[in-house]
A protein has these predicted regions:
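Residue-level "contact hotspot" at macromolecular interaction interfaces
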Residues: 16, 37, 69, 81, ...
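Short, conserved secondary-structure segments in the cores of folded domains
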Residues: 13, 34, 39, 130, ...
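Ferredoxin-reductase
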Residues: 99-190, 208
Length: 242
């Protein structure tokens, strides 16, 4: 299917989209810079507008849908899929990714090396079928057949052109995926993953002191930033407050 992202400023980009492909993922993998933060339906940052009936809204009991007026054609890019060729209106600037940036893509990965490091907290590694380069602070979204929808996990390591991603995973009360992982007896678990994505990243060329606060996004992304900074000996010249 052909999808056209556009805004009222006249900026527009046309891409090919797969059947049942999530519209945010389709745009990002084709290099279109789209509005998003969580990519999983929590924040509502990717709200868009399409002609009613052209998009499967896939409404769920998620916080991101609270201010979405579905009857008027609004939906979330991170949940919606196209029914047919369609136009998607966005209330934001549109542009293409820099040529040197790693575009996100789908691949199969195996989660292994489970190790308990604290109560209800484990570390584990994703072994990828293809290598990726990611910025410190970025994340991936993962999908397992036993759980509906995607879940986001930030990497704790930093390595360019890597086929291994390290995670910290906390078992959440009523967390369907984490409950499954903590109950599983398997040595490895197969996932579909999409990434790298995320805009809250570390750029050492900015040459600034760092203030790092772990909130709703957790500590994992900050660990990746610290790893990258340590590799560069960044803190020999700049300060960090945690």
């Amino acid at each position: 299917m052909v999808i056209k992202y556009l805004n009222k400023k006249g900026q527009e980009f046309e891409i090919d989209c797969g059947k049942d492909e999530i519209l945010l993922q389709a745009g990002l993998r084709n290099g279109v810079v789209l509005p998003y933060e969580c990519s999983t339906g929590t924040c509502g940052s990717c709200k868009a507008l399409a002609k009613p009936g052209t998009v499967n809204v896939n409404e769920k009991d998620l916080d991101g849908f609270k201010n979405v007026k579905i009857s008027k054609g609004e939906f979330l890019l991170c949940q919606g899929t196209a029914k047919e060729n369609c136009k998607i209106l966005l209330n934001t600037n549109l542009s293409k990714s820099n040529k040197d940036e790693q575009l996100p893509f789908h691949q199969i990965a195996y989660l292994k090396d489970f190790k308990e490091v604290a109560r209800e907290t484990i570390t584990a590694n994703f072994y990828l079928s293809g290598k990726i380069s990611f910025k410190a602070g970025q994340y991936i979204i993962v999908k397992h057949p036993s759980v509906e929808g995607y879940r986001a996990y930030s990497m704790t390591n930093f390595e360019e052109n890597s086929d291994l991603l390290s995670l910290v995973i906390k078992n959440k009360i009523n967390g369907k995926l984490t409950n499954y992982l903590f109950d599983s007896k398997d040595d490895e678990i197969k996932f579909d993953i999409f990434g790298p994505i995320g805009k809250a990243t570390f750029n050492p060329l900015e040459k600034k002191n760092l203030l790092m606060i772990a909130g709703g996004t957790g500590i994992a992304g900050l660990m990746s930033i610290l790893n990258h900074a340590d590799q560069l000996r960044y803190f020999e010249d700049y300060k960090v407050d945690l």
